[in-house]
Amino acid sequence: MLILTRRVGETLMIGDDVSVTVLGVKGNQVRIGVNAPRDVSVHREEIYDRIRHEKEGGPEDKGNSE
């Protein structure tokens, strides 16, 4: 894992098309902004895991979500 230090307002680049900017820090929360092409999905990890689980689980999981 690459570990980088950035201050509020500073940006890091991932490849040529994705930028991540630190927008603010309040306590133990960090607000970041991500600029990426529309064909690149950007999700919080817990949302990504839920999407992946729903895709793997198939239609039977849909009834449990309501």
Curated annotation (Swiss-Prot):
Its domain of life reads: Bacteria
Q: Which family does it belong to?
A: Belongs to the CsrA/RsmA family.
User: Which keywords, in A-to-Z order, does the entry hold?
Assistant: Activator, Cytoplasm, Repressor, RNA-binding, Translation regulation
Q: Which cysteines are joined by disulfide bonds?
A: none
UniProt keyword annotation of Repressor present: yes
Q: Which GO terms describe its biological process?
A: mRNA catabolic process; negative regulation of translational initiation; positive regulation of translational initiation; regulation of carbohydrate metabolic process
Please tell me one Gene Ontology term that the record gives under cellular component.
Answer: cytosol
Q: What does this protein do?
A: A key translational regulator that binds mRNA to regulate translation initiation and/or mRNA stability. Mediates global changes in gene expression, shifting from rapid growth to stress survival by linking envelope stress, the stringent response and the catabolite repression systems. Usually binds in the 5'-UTR; binding at or near the Shine-Dalgarno sequence prevents ribosome-binding, repressing translation, binding elsewhere in the 5'-UTR can activate translation and/or stabilize the mRNA. Its function is antagonized by small RNA(s).
Q: How does it assemble?
A: Homodimer; the beta-strands of each monomer intercalate to form a hydrophobic core, while the alpha-helices form wings that extend away from the core.
What GO terms are given for molecular function? Answer: mRNA 5'-UTR binding
Q: What is this protein called?
A: Translational regulator CsrA
Gene name?
csrA
Q: Which organism is it from?
A: Alkalilimnicola ehrlichii (strain ATCC BAA-1101 / DSM 17681 / MLHE-1)
